[in-house]
Amino acid sequence: MLFPVKRLIIENTGYKRDISLRTMYINSSSIASITDYDGATEFLLRENSDLQDKSFSLIKLNNIADDIIALGSAQQIYSTVREHKTGKHLLHD
């Protein structure tokens, strides 16, 4: 079952970095682990970003080397995964 997360995107534009959030959909059966990630907060503080007061999680996926830094605590994301796994949803929701 696919569920939405807001992924932290950091793009190096030369002398500064552009920081944004982008919605992406993850298949819940491909998740290996979800952990709280304090490293994002420390980085955002250094970059003086307006996202510095938010919590972030590190999502590790099976068979993919790239990890996802997502907006929300590990508990919040886990709750979203469980909600999408147990509930019936229309494909376009």
Task: Please place each PLM-identified region on the residue numbering.
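Acidic, Ser/Thr- and proline-rich intrinsically disordered linker/docking segments
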Residues: F3-P4, I9-N12, K16-Y25, S30-D93
